[in-house]
Amino acid sequence: FQCSGITSGQTRTVTAQDSDLIMAGTNLAQSFSKPQTGALVTLTPGSTVAWDMGLSNNYTLTLGDNSTALSNPTNEVAGTSGSVLLIQDGTGSRVISFGTHYFFAGGTDAVLSTAGNAVDRLDYFVQAADKVHCVVTKALAAS
């Protein structure tokens, strides 16, 4: 399906087979009868981890380096929220540091669980393009 030549304020009629066309608006309240689910995107592990927030709302990162820096995310949009599963590899005791866009309660970066295969969850809310509010829930059941 392709639209062209439609400008704001115009009305068009679209004919499509049942269940072939799903449209959502960006400027109105909407209700959905089923969950709207984004992909769980795997961040590439390493000593410095790049995070493109434009790919999804939910991510997973397995820590395998002794020290990992989570870089400031790209494509931050105010109002975006989601989660990042932070998973220790089998060795454990991996540490993480955060870029300057991340803000935690009390002004202190989160310290992760250190057991091998431990799972922590970082929940985030983007206040502005350079302000990502974060909270970490530690020691969740293994994934």
PLM region descriptions:
Residues 55-61:
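Short carbohydrate-recognition loop motifs
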Residues 31-55:
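Extracellular beta-solenoid/beta-roll
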